[in-house]
Amino acid sequence: MEIRPWEESDRPFLRTLYLHARREGWPWLDASEWRLEDFDADTLGETILVAQEDGHRLGFASIAENDNFLHHLFVAPDAQGRGVGAALLEAVQARFTSTGALKCMEKNTRALRFYARHGWVEEGHGDAPEGTYVLLHFRKP
Protein backbone atom coordinates (compact mmCIF):
# COMPACT_ATOMS: atom_id res chain seq x y z
CA MET A 1 0.00 0.00 0.00
CA GLU A 2 1.20 3.46 -0.86
CA ILE A 3 0.36 6.69 0.99
CA ARG A 4 0.93 9.65 -1.31
CA PRO A 5 0.01 13.31 -1.71
CA TRP A 6 -3.27 13.84 -3.51
CA GLU A 7 -3.46 14.77 -7.18
CA GLU A 8 -6.24 16.58 -9.01
CA SER A 9 -7.20 13.29 -10.70
CA ASP A 10 -8.15 11.97 -7.22
CA ARG A 11 -10.88 14.58 -6.76
CA PRO A 12 -13.87 12.57 -8.13
CA PHE A 13 -13.06 9.57 -5.93
CA LEU A 14 -12.37 11.70 -2.84
CA ARG A 15 -15.58 13.70 -3.28
CA THR A 16 -17.63 10.52 -3.60
CA LEU A 17 -15.94 8.81 -0.66
CA TYR A 18 -16.34 11.89 1.53
CA LEU A 19 -20.05 12.18 0.78
CA HIS A 20 -20.91 8.50 1.17
CA ALA A 21 -18.69 7.81 4.18
CA ARG A 22 -20.24 10.69 6.11
CA ARG A 23 -23.74 9.46 5.28
CA GLU A 24 -22.85 5.95 6.46
CA GLY A 25 -20.72 6.93 9.45
CA TRP A 26 -22.87 9.74 10.83
CA PRO A 27 -26.46 8.44 10.51
CA TRP A 28 -27.71 10.72 13.31
CA LEU A 29 -27.11 13.80 11.14
CA ASP A 30 -29.38 15.16 8.40
CA ALA A 31 -27.45 14.54 5.18
CA SER A 32 -30.09 15.94 2.84
CA GLU A 33 -28.07 19.07 2.11
CA TRP A 34 -24.68 17.36 1.69
CA ARG A 35 -23.13 17.52 -1.78
CA LEU A 36 -20.07 16.16 -3.57
CA GLU A 37 -18.62 19.67 -3.61
CA ASP A 38 -18.49 19.72 0.21
CA PHE A 39 -15.16 17.93 -0.05
CA ASP A 40 -13.62 20.94 -1.84
CA ALA A 41 -14.71 23.46 0.79
CA ASP A 42 -14.05 21.21 3.78
CA THR A 43 -10.45 20.44 2.79
CA LEU A 44 -9.48 23.84 1.37
CA GLY A 45 -5.90 24.69 2.33
CA GLU A 46 -5.27 21.29 3.90
CA THR A 47 -2.68 18.67 3.08
CA ILE A 48 -4.42 15.61 1.66
CA LEU A 49 -2.89 12.14 1.69
CA VAL A 50 -4.32 9.28 -0.37
CA ALA A 51 -4.01 5.55 0.33
CA GLN A 52 -3.66 3.53 -2.84
CA GLU A 53 -2.96 -0.11 -3.67
CA ASP A 54 -2.50 -1.64 -7.11
CA GLY A 55 -3.84 1.54 -8.70
CA HIS A 56 -6.99 1.59 -6.55
CA ARG A 57 -7.68 4.47 -4.19
CA LEU A 58 -8.70 3.21 -0.76
CA GLY A 59 -9.04 6.28 1.46
CA PHE A 60 -7.71 9.68 2.42
CA ALA A 61 -6.73 11.90 5.31
CA SER A 62 -6.66 15.69 5.39
CA ILE A 63 -4.51 17.69 7.77
CA ALA A 64 -4.24 21.32 8.83
CA GLU A 65 -0.47 21.01 9.12
CA ASN A 66 0.23 24.35 10.82
CA ASP A 67 -2.04 23.25 13.66
CA ASN A 68 -1.00 19.56 13.74
CA PHE A 69 -4.72 18.86 13.30
CA LEU A 70 -6.17 15.78 11.63
CA HIS A 71 -9.38 17.06 10.08
CA HIS A 72 -10.62 14.03 8.13
CA LEU A 73 -9.77 10.35 7.78
CA PHE A 74 -12.04 8.19 5.64
CA VAL A 75 -11.60 4.69 4.22
CA ALA A 76 -13.73 3.17 1.46
CA PRO A 77 -16.16 0.57 2.88
CA ASP A 78 -14.66 -2.27 0.83
CA ALA A 79 -11.17 -1.41 2.12
CA GLN A 80 -12.02 -1.26 5.83
CA GLY A 81 -10.39 -3.77 8.14
CA ARG A 82 -7.30 -4.05 5.93
CA GLY A 83 -5.01 -1.58 7.70
CA VAL A 84 -5.75 1.36 5.40
CA GLY A 85 -6.88 3.65 8.20
CA ALA A 86 -3.89 2.68 10.32
CA ALA A 87 -1.50 3.38 7.43
CA LEU A 88 -3.06 6.79 6.81
CA LEU A 89 -2.98 7.62 10.51
CA GLU A 90 0.67 6.62 10.77
CA ALA A 91 1.52 8.87 7.81
CA VAL A 92 -0.38 11.76 9.40
CA GLN A 93 1.30 11.29 12.78
CA ALA A 94 4.71 11.30 11.10
CA ARG A 95 3.95 14.80 9.75
CA PHE A 96 3.09 16.27 13.15
CA THR A 97 5.76 18.58 14.55
CA SER A 98 4.32 18.45 18.08
CA THR A 99 1.19 17.10 19.78
CA GLY A 100 -1.44 16.18 17.21
CA ALA A 101 -5.13 16.87 17.67
CA LEU A 102 -8.46 15.84 16.22
CA LYS A 103 -12.14 16.13 17.02
CA CYS A 104 -14.35 13.06 16.76
CA MET A 105 -18.10 13.03 17.20
CA GLU A 106 -18.99 11.39 20.51
CA LYS A 107 -21.56 9.18 18.74
CA ASN A 108 -18.89 7.86 16.36
CA THR A 109 -17.83 5.11 18.76
CA ARG A 110 -16.15 3.04 16.06
CA ALA A 111 -13.78 5.89 15.21
CA LEU A 112 -13.14 6.63 18.88
CA ARG A 113 -12.09 3.00 19.45
CA PHE A 114 -9.84 3.16 16.38
CA TYR A 115 -8.02 6.26 17.62
CA ALA A 116 -7.66 4.87 21.14
CA ARG A 117 -6.04 1.70 19.73
CA HIS A 118 -3.50 3.95 18.02
CA GLY A 119 -2.47 5.90 21.10
CA TRP A 120 -4.77 8.92 20.94
CA VAL A 121 -6.04 10.10 24.32
CA GLU A 122 -9.17 11.98 25.26
CA GLU A 123 -8.50 15.55 26.37
CA GLY A 124 -12.00 16.97 26.62
CA HIS A 125 -15.42 17.47 25.07
CA GLY A 126 -17.08 20.28 23.20
CA ASP A 127 -20.29 21.15 21.44
CA ALA A 128 -20.73 21.67 17.72
CA PRO A 129 -23.84 22.07 15.56
CA GLU A 130 -23.53 18.34 14.72
CA GLY A 131 -23.46 17.33 18.39
CA THR A 132 -20.92 16.69 21.12
CA TYR A 133 -17.37 15.97 20.02
CA VAL A 134 -14.39 14.46 21.81
CA LEU A 135 -11.06 16.27 21.55
CA LEU A 136 -8.22 13.76 21.19
CA HIS A 137 -4.46 14.30 21.32
CA PHE A 138 -1.53 12.28 20.06
CA ARG A 139 1.85 12.92 21.62
CA LYS A 140 4.83 12.08 19.49
CA PRO A 141 7.20 9.65 21.21
What are these regions (language model features)?
Residues 116-125:
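Conserved acetyl-CoA-binding loop of GNAT-fold acetyltransferases
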Residues 81-94, 113, 117:
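Conserved acetyl-CoA-binding loop-helix of GNAT-fold acetyltransferases
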Residues 1-9, 140-141:
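Conserved N-terminal entry element of GNAT/NAT acetyltransferase domains
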Residues 76-82, 106-107:
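Active-site acidic-Proline motif in GNAT/NAT acetyltransferases
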Residues 85, 89, 107-111, 128-134:
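Short glycine/proline-centered loop/turn elements that form peptide/ligand docking sites
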Residues 52-54, 138-141:
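Active-site beta-strand termini and strand-to-loop segments that position acidic
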